[in-house]
Regions:
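Short, well-structured N-terminal submotif of metal-dependent ribonuclease cores
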Residues: 1-38, 51-58, 118, 130-142
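A residue-level structural signature of the nucleotidyltransferase/glycosyltransferase Rossmann-like core
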Residues: 2, 35, 72, 108, ...
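A conserved hydrophobic position in a structured secondary element of the catalytic/binding core
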Residues: 5, 38, 75, 111, ...
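Short amphipathic alpha-helical segments and helix-helix/interface helices
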Residues: 23-27, 63, 96-97
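Structured helix-beta-strand junction loops
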Residues: 32-33, 69, 86, 119
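Short acidic, glycine/proline-enriched helix-loop-strand junctions
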Residues: 57-80, 115-142
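Active-site neighborhoods of divalent-metal-dependent phosphate/nucleic-acid chemistry enzymes
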Residues: 71-113, 140-142
Length: 142
C-alpha cells in the first residue's frame, strides 16, 4: 500500500514525542510492507525543525535514514495550483494532499486527521492504520 507520511508522524520519531512507538512501527512497515512517500516540502521543514531542537547533523542524519525507505512525491506547478483550490484551511495540509495525489497514495498518515476531512485522499493516524492493517504474524515453525 502506498502511504504519504505527514511531517508530524516523522517528528514523533525524530523528537521522541508522544506517539513515537506507533509512528516508529508504521515507518518500519514502510521499509518492508508498504511504500512510504514524503512531500517534497516536508523534507526541508523536517530538517529545519529537527535542527532547531537538536543539531544540523542529527537533522540531516534523520532525513538520510528516512530516504532509505521513503520516496519523495514528484510535484510541480500544476500540483501547487490544485492545492490552492482544495477546500482546506491550511495550505501546507493542501500541499500534503497534492503530494499524496501525485504519488498515488491510498492514505495520508498524520496526527491531525481532522485537518484532512476535505481531502480526497483519506487520512488516518498511525495507531488507526496499524489497527486496520496489522502486520501479519510470522508463520509458526512446523
Amino acid at each position: 500500500m502506498r502511504l504519504l507520511i505527514d511531517i508530524n508522524v516523522l517528528l514523533d520519531v525524530a523528537l521522541q514525542r508522544p506517539g513515537a512507538a506507533a509512528s516508529a512501527r508504521l515507518l518500519a512497515l514502510c521499509g518492508r510492507r508498504h511504500e512510504g512517500w514524503l512531500a517534497w516540502h516536508s523534507v526541508a521543514t523536517l530538517a529545519y525543525l529537527i535542527e532547531r531542537q537538536q543539531s544540523a547533523i542529527s537533522g540531516r542524519d534523520f532525513i538520510r535514514s528516512m530516504l532509505v525507505w521513503a520516496d519523495v512525491a514528484k510535484t510541480g506547478r500544476p500540483d501547487a495550483l490544485a492545492a490552492l483550490d482544495l477546500p482546506m484551511h491550511d495550505f501546507e495540509d493542501a500541499l500534503q494532499v497534492a503530494a499524496a495525489m501525485a504519488c498515488g497514495a491510498q492514505f495520508i498518515i498524520t496526527r491531525n486527521e481532522r485537518d484532512f476531512k476535505a481531502s480526497p485522499v483519506p487520512a488516518l493516524n498511525p495507531e488507526a492504520f496499524l489497527r486496520r492493517y496489522p502486520e501479519p504474524s510470522p508463520p509458526a515453525d512446523s
